[in-house]
A protein has these predicted regions:
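Alpha-helical ds-nucleic-acid-binding substructure associated with the helix-hairpin-helix region
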Residues: 21-22, 26-97, 152-154
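Generic structural signal for isolated residues within well-ordered alpha-helices
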Residues: 16, 32, 94, 130, ...
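A broad detector of the eukaryotic-type serine/threonine protein kinase catalytic domain
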Residues: 17, 50, 74, 78, ...
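Alpha-helical scaffold segments that form or flank carboxylate-/histidine-based iron centers
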Residues: 4-18
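N-terminal alpha-helical segment
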Residues: 9-13, 45-49, 87-91, 127, ...
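C-terminal accessory module of base-excision DNA glycosylases/AP lyases that mediates lesion recognition
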Residues: 84, 88-90, 103-175
Length: 175
């Protein structure tokens, strides 16, 4: 079953760490990252030396992105404290302004932190691979086809996505 991460800061950091790398590589970096401080906060992260973050496996770009998230959390406490009360479009419009946070990261956040039930991360490679396999379609899948699948699975796209990922890798993903 899917486990929600109620620590929104950690969830967004985990999504950045997990961008464009395998689940096992992401998990290894996450373990090293949280060994630095299991109760990482935005203020603590901003004090960590770049060399330390590079040693645990973060690229210079990902380091900048997690710093951007840290600054956002410091500057937007009211929004963060009430984020679960906003609808998807408001959350997307606010988070997309953080450099390094794109639709994929927001999709992961909506699924794994806020528990939104109808998110289909169409830009996710695993999601697309699993649909390709399930429906015997060649990659890359076009947007029109993905939209058709999205409508078919509404309002349960998040659950369908989770099971699609499980069809490729039995290790549950969490962010």
């Amino acid at each position: 079953h899917m486990i929600l991460n109620s620590n929104y800061y950690h969830a967004l950091l985990n999504s950045i760490i997990g961008q464009q790398i395998s689940v096992s590589a992401a998990n290894a970096v996450k373990i090293r990252f949280f060994k630095l401080d299991k109760n990482m906060t935005p203020k603590k992260l901003l004090k960590i030396d770049i060399r330390t973050l590079k040693k645990i496996g973060l690229s210079r770009q990902k380091i900048q992105y997690i710093k951007n998230i840290s600054i956002f959390f410091i500057e937007n406490k009211k929004f963060i404290n009430k984020i679960d009360q906003y609808d998807e479009s408001v959350i997307r419009s606010k988070l997309i302004d953080i450099k390094g946070v794109g639709n994929w990261t927001i999709d992961m956040f909506l699924i794994f932190s806020l528990g939104h039930s109808n998110i289909a991360p169409r830009g996710d490679l695993g999601f697309n691979k699993a649909i390709s396999k399930l429906y015997n379609k060649k990659l890359p899948l076009n947007d029109k086809y993905l939209l058709k699948i999205y409508k078919l699975w509404t309002p349960y796209n998040s659950m369908a996505t989770w099971y699609l990922w499980r069809s490729l890798d039995p290790i549950p993903i969490s962010y």
